[in-house]
Amino acid sequence: MTKYAKIIGTGSYLPPRRVTNHDLATQLAEKGIETSDDWIVSRSGISARHWAEPDVTSSDLAVKAAEQAIEAAGIDRQSIDLIIVATSTPDFVFPSTACIVQEKLGITNHCPAFDLQAVCSGFVYALATADKFIRSGSHRNVLVIGTEVFSRILDFNDRTTCVLFGDGAGAVLLSASEEPGILSTAMHSDGRHVDILCVPGNVAGGNITGNPFLHMDGQAVFKLAVNVLDKVAREAMEAASVTPGQIDWLIPHQANIRIMQGTAKKLGLPAERMVATVHEHGNTSAASIPLALDVAVRDGRIRAGQTVLMEGVGGGFTWGAVLLRM
């Protein structure tokens, strides 16, 4: 049985359209809704986000990120034997976005491909799932992607949510290895909190039933997130006998700089050891962690042999952590 699942390549993609807080404030003002750069930055740390054009889908973003990860890994794409896509904004009700990505990438080896839906915890859940497949010995090269077009589900009459989210994709290639890779994973959920972060609508009989836009109780999410993120991070570290002092980099879900800083502080980690891209990306849900990872890998901050702690929290309520060696 393979001992580890190791990241051998990363990639990411942001749509070209960059929307600043000033741009968004101008757009909302036309609807009679007040906001400002200061208001958004002070509450979230977000200065800009990227939004996809109307004809661009989650799979389009995913393919761009995957191409980079495959190139970085230096492997034949036909050797990929499993594709997992974490998304809450799939191209269609079905088939899965993962199958669409498989076709667009030209992977013709009939490997399994499926979507995983855990909202902003999605990438952590997907990474943990891929880890289990590799450790079992059933698969050797797994493409894991987080991709979202949250701009499609934003209510632009609600300034408390529409200013927070962006679109994008991030990807990693995990490969079976005898060298340390993923050291531990931890995942949890609590369905009692379904209503604090959700899109409470559906399509039935060709009609939309309920609210098709994102709804969030920001205060409830904040309180729960800081609490569970600290606990799940410590759970993952304890499982691998790693202390906070041994963590080189913390990559939290990029939702809100205050939640991120609160989590780092509880763990006793200085801000300099936290990768933060929320100011430029906004909250990209399942894409946020792999996007931040790829940015830090490509700018040289994250290097081979370093210990990285990733943690995410999202609707459901879901949360999880992955501790790994690069």
Swiss-Prot record:
Residues 254-258 are annotated as: ACP-binding. The gene is fabH. HAMAP family: FabH (MF_01815). One of its GO terms (biological process) is secondary metabolite biosynthetic process. CDD domains: KAS_III. One of its GO terms (cellular component) is cytoplasm. Transmembrane segments: none annotated. This is Beta-ketoacyl-[acyl-carrier-protein] synthase III. One of its GO terms (molecular function) is beta-ketoacyl-acyl-carrier-protein synthase III activity. It comes from Cupriavidus necator (strain ATCC 17699 / DSM 428 / KCTC 22496 / NCIMB 10442 / H16 / Stanier 337) (Ralstonia eutropha). It holds the Pfam family ACP_syn_III_C. Pathway: Lipid metabolism; fatty acid biosynthesis. It catalyses: malonyl-[ACP] + acetyl-CoA + H(+) = 3-oxobutanoyl-[ACP] + CO2 + CoA. Its EC number is 2.3.1.180. Homodimer.
